[in-house]
Amino acid sequence: MNEYPTADEVLIVAEYACGFRPIVRDPGLFESSMMRPTATVFGADAYPTVWDKAAALLHSMVTTQALADGNKRTGWAACWLLLGLNGHHVSPDLDVDAAEQFVLDIAANKLGWEQIAEQLPKFAEPTDKGAVS
């Protein structure tokens, strides 16, 4: 079973990622972004793997602009918080420039959630045996 971050947890990691506590400009969009990974369609998970769920969260946080500032940084942090809760962690050898370009491509609507889910594992360290798929 997957674990999901709370809105408060996301805002806490966002504060570290941004250097300030982001202001939620649109609470409805923020809540919608937070809930997207848990969506179901006809009783089945709309985003079946943890990578799909993290991609859906990252995509929503970056593209909906629910925050006054820091949407991209918060999206990246929230994505890795969700993945971390499920046993996946950012690689210690993270290519920061590649990660930045990845998030910028999401913000420019060049990547959909499916493409994001395919690419996220390249930013992760090798999977622990206890990690959720």
Regions found by a protein language model. Give the residues of each.
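FIC/Doc superfamily catalytic core
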Residues: 1-133
